[in-house]
A protein has these predicted regions:
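A short secondary-structure junction signal
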Residues: 175-181, 188-190, 210-216, 225-229, ...
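Double-stranded beta-helix
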Residues: 209-279
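Internal hydrophobic scaffold segments of catalytic domains
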Residues: 90-95, 99, 198, 204-227
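Short, solvent-exposed loop/turn segments at secondary-structure junctions
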Residues: 89-91, 166-169, 173, 184, ...
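Short, conserved beta-strand element in jelly-roll/cupin
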Residues: 154, 187-209, 266-269, 274, ...
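Generic beta-strand structural signal
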Residues: 157-164, 175, 194-202, 212, ...
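Catalytic core of Fe(II)/2-oxoglutarate
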Residues: 251-316
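Non-heme Fe(II)-dependent double-stranded beta-helix
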Residues: 6-80, 86-179, 183-190, 310, ...
Length: 332
């Protein structure tokens, strides 16, 4: 299998909605919902009858495709909903990525941009989005077979970058993030139809139990947990700093953790964490002196591009939900 060498931050011609058989209804989400039953309803006004709903989509869809992941690794991903690959990148290549991250995060021109998020109590950048557009080096990393090729094996088709970002959790000051399924947000607020997406997080600093590593509930990807509460207008402006809507109930989390437990993959810088779009995850605050950072790509399948949002008045800005034909110019 050969991943296309064309960088994902360049323009590629794809069919527009008007040319596609599954074009969304132009009359908006209500008209669409009237015609297509939502398999994953969320942002509900009343508590759901069932605590969770069974997943309707396969987890690993590209076993027949060649790529960097072995059958055993695909089996582990299918079973747990995530896979950690230690030491994917090392040496000079890793150091160059760290320097690139520092240059991006210290660029004062990004401080007041919509695509940067600062710590709630400071002006230090916590997350920087659209990084595969901002950085040619990271754009190439998004196309690297070790990363995009693995995503292709999991989602079963050619990927495009739905979202990219750098996360930085400083020592002593890095805040935590509540439990959530990324797919719940992407479905409700971006209009992602199905669970044909995977996240790839390359850790740029050592991850240990004290610096707020990502915690995941293995097996939770097989269940969709509907969440209560309507989506506020421009919810992304607050949710990127502290998520309050789209959070599973304590009852659902308690049951899932009792059944599956919690795991927090740890390791040296350069490891790659792949996790399913629906795997429930969270992170604690970083109370250690050691910062934690990663570069993060969400790969979505071409035929799963976003439509009208299922539980929001309008889609989030494109720096959070790129299109397959997205161009880099707005970010440079």
């Amino acid at each position: 299998m050969t991943v296309k060498s064309t960088p994902l931050y360049t323009v590629t011609a794809h069919k527009q909605y008007s040319e596609m058989a599954d074009a969304p209804n132009v009359n908006g989400p209500k008209a669409m919902d009237a015609q297509v039953k939502d398999a994953y309803p969320s942002r509900l006004a009343n508590p759901p009858v069932e605590t969770w709903l069974p997943r309707q989509d396969a987890v690993v869809k590209g076993r027949q495709l060649s790529g960097p992941l072995s059958s055993a690794q695909l089996d582990e991903f299918e079973r747990k909903g995530f896979l950690f690959i230690p030491n994917l990148i090392e040496g000079e290549e890793l150091e160059e990525l760290r320097q690139e991250m520092k240059a991006l995060m210290s660029n004062d021109e990004y401080l007041d941009q919509d695509f940067s998020v600062t710590e709630p109590e400071s002006q230090e950048i916590r997350s920087l989005f659209a990084v595969h557009f901002l950085s040619e080096r990271l754009g190439k990393l998004a196309c690297d077979q070790r990363v995009a090729g693995a995503a292709r094996q999991i989602i079963g088709g050619d990927p495009y970058v739905h979202q990219s970002r750098i996360n930085y959790k400083p020592g002593f000051a890095g805040k935590g993030f509540n439990w959530h399924s990324d797919f719940e947000t992407w479905h409700a607020e971006d209009g992602m139809p199905a669970m044909h997406a995977v996240s790839a997080s390359l850790i740029l600093t050592d991850n240990h139990e004290f610096n707020g590593p990502l915690m995941l509930i293995p097996g939770s990807h097989q269940k969709f947990v509907p969440c209560l509460g309507a989506t506020p207008e421009d919810n992304h402006k607050s949710s990127l700093k502290a998520q309050e809507v789209g959070v599973p109930s304590s009852e659902a989390l308690t049951e899932l953790v009792a059944k599956h437990g919690i795991e927090a993959p740890k390791g040296k810088a350069g490891g790659l964490l792949l996790f399913d779009c629906n795997t429930l995850h969270a992170s604690n605050a970083n109370l250690s002196p050691d910062p934690r950072s990663n570069v993060f790509f969400v790969f979505n399948r071409q035929d799963n591009r976003c439509r009208e949002p299922y539980a929001a008045a309008r889609q989030r800005p494109d720096f959070l939900a790129h299109r397959p034909d997205q161009q880099a110019q707005p970010y440079r």
